[in-house]
Amino acid sequence: MNNTHSSVLNKVAYLILHGFDKSYRWHSRITRDAQQRFEQALWQETQKAVKERIAIYERTLADAVGEIYQQVFPHQENNQFWFDLKTRYQKILSDHPQYELAETFYNSVLGRIFKHQKINDEMMFIMPTRCYLAGLQRHLVVHSFDTSGTVRRMLEDIFSQYHFDIAFQDMQRDLQHLDGALRARLNREQLASVHTVEMLKPVFYRSKSAYLIGRICMPDETLPFVIPLSIAEAETSGEKHKIVVEALLTERQDLSVVFSFARAYFMADTQHPAEVVAFLHELLPHKKKFELYIALGLYKHGKTVFYRNFLAHLEESNDQFSIAPGIRGLVMAVFHLPSYGVVFKIIKDEFPESKKITRQHVKDCYKLVKMTDRVGRMADTHEYVNFRLPRHRVEQALVDELLDCCASSIELTDEEVIIKHLYIERKMTPLNIFLEQQPDPALITSALNDLGLCIKQIAAAHIFAGDMLHKNFGITRGGRVIFYDYDEICYLTEREFRTLPKSDDPYAIDTLSVGPTDVFPEQFEHFIVGKKHLKQELKALHGEIMTAEYWQHMQAQSLKGDVPDFIPYNQAKRFVN
């Protein structure tokens, strides 16, 4: 290797690393400021910070690629240059505290340069370069607490390690609540057997809440130990806000809901994300590590880990990709691999006349959801380009379907089906299928009630779901209804909610002047669910969503800038309701 070649490799490798470091510093700064926003109850600033942090990656990526083009002409370099560059970059990452994220950033740079056409492990970090040994850096991210004294003393020790700039409203009351809740969860023998309590050092901030996350370690069992915090806002401008302990969560299901794929990303400041994810994975072993990276707002690396998991699953399975069950959409073609827990969604080339939207509009809607607090009711999605499937694993019926409705997004080779653009989303049972197949009337009622709550909670987040046919909702294994069809989603303030005119003339509605943003909620009862008895039951449970007055009230709340509380865990767990 000549000196010039080596010098250029060094320069480009360090440009990429500097780009990543800049990105992560910026990400960390916004994350670190979450404490101040929480303590000062700056809820609108919190929402802005979420959007700003998501946008950082693309901005720093564009800067890094631009700087590389000033140093080399990438397309004039042969493949050996890029093989050598990966090796050089790998060497300078040897002691980097976020090496796994830096590898993903490298992949993004090369993906941008080559428009994602050259995806191979010789040139990029398709597979990880090392096996992360969880626990070696545990002391950097975890506080360990002595449990030989009283429960009260242990709790006091825990709070002494978290340094807030405002006081608790009533610490003695909060300690009493926590003490009582822990004693209610563990019997005397279990309490006596607790040998350690470990708490993550970063505080996890999201929306109007903060979480202290840890675990109780016993010889035969380890339980989550999670303390949600909220702000009691000051009544006068001269006073400071106060912190309130909301609950104690000790069940994995409660923590799983807190880390749901349908919620906004946390802000948890750490320089050792892999160790934090490893700890969380021990608490939530049924969650994939890619889900936990994404929950921390490291969604680009989460996508990398997902893709690695996906490739491993392909090696271990033999079923075929097929059209997803359910009613086919007007805007998206949806398919799945039956043995895998996601669906793949491709924007169709053409939409029916009833959908007065464009391809870019659909992309903008999906971006809006990414940037919004999804309040546990809207599924997160992940965007990929040039996503490759082995052709022998794709059913011919699916190939034919994709070529028929998404031809501009599909490239076929003898070996692969290459999808130029798609979204990946968690797989759920479509609500219409659930309602058709569920024999238990109580579970049907529960699902319909949750459907209404889903629509209301999305509205409380200042979002109008748009196309609210029940086929556009899914239901999770836990019975939670989630919205997942975003092509008509918009802010509440972008719609005009109107009341239908009262008239005995059956043709009056045909002559009604309707603008492009007009919505008549009274019509919702006719199309949200299909069968008459389901319509009646939904109306009995949530009839207000079928009135213009309800939506006008929600618009007024949105215009005032109100940010409601969205408590992810069971309200019954709260100490003070």
Swiss-Prot record:
Q: Which reaction does it catalyse?
A: L-seryl-[isocitrate dehydrogenase] + ATP = O-phospho-L-seryl-[isocitrate dehydrogenase] + ADP + H(+)
Q: Which residues cross the membrane?
A: none
Binding-site list for ATP: 324-330, 345
Q: Which residues participate directly in catalysis?
A: 380
> What Pfam families does the annotation carry?
AceK_kinase (PF06315), AceK_regulatory (PF20423)
Which cellular component terms (GO) are annotated to the entry? cytoplasm
InterPro entries per record: AceK_kinase (IPR046855), AceK_regulatory (IPR046854), Isocitrate_DH_AceK (IPR010452)
Sorted keywords for this record are: ATP-binding, Cytoplasm, Glyoxylate bypass, Hydrolase, Kinase, Nucleotide-binding, Protein phosphatase, Serine/threonine-protein kinase, Transferase, Tricarboxylic acid cycle
Q: Which GO terms describe its molecular function?
A: [isocitrate dehydrogenase (NADP+)] kinase activity; AMP binding; ATP binding; phosphoprotein phosphatase activity; protein serine/threonine kinase activity
This protein's major location comes to cytoplasm
Q: Name one GO biological process term.
A: glyoxylate cycle
Q: Give yes or no: UniProt keyword Cytoplasm.
A: yes
- Is the keyword Transferase assigned to this protein? yes
Q: What is its EC number?
A: 2.7.11.5, 3.1.3.-
Where in or outside the cell it occurs: the entry states: Cytoplasm
Cross-referenced HAMAP family? AceK
| Cited function | Bifunctional enzyme which can phosphorylate or dephosphorylate isocitrate dehydrogenase (IDH) on a specific serine residue. This is a regulatory mechanism which enables bacteria to bypass the Krebs cycle via the glyoxylate shunt in response to the source of carbon. When bacteria are grown on glucose, IDH is fully active and unphosphorylated, but when grown on acetate or ethanol, the activity of IDH declines drastically concomitant with its phosphorylation.
Task: Tell me which PANTHER family the record gives.
Answer: ISOCITRATE DEHYDROGENASE KINASE_PHOSPHATASE, PTHR39559
Q: Family per UniProt?
A: Belongs to the AceK family.
Instruction: Supply the name of the protein.
Output: Isocitrate dehydrogenase kinase/phosphatase
Write down the species: Pseudoalteromonas atlantica (strain T6c / ATCC BAA-1087)
Q: Gene encoding this chain? A: aceK
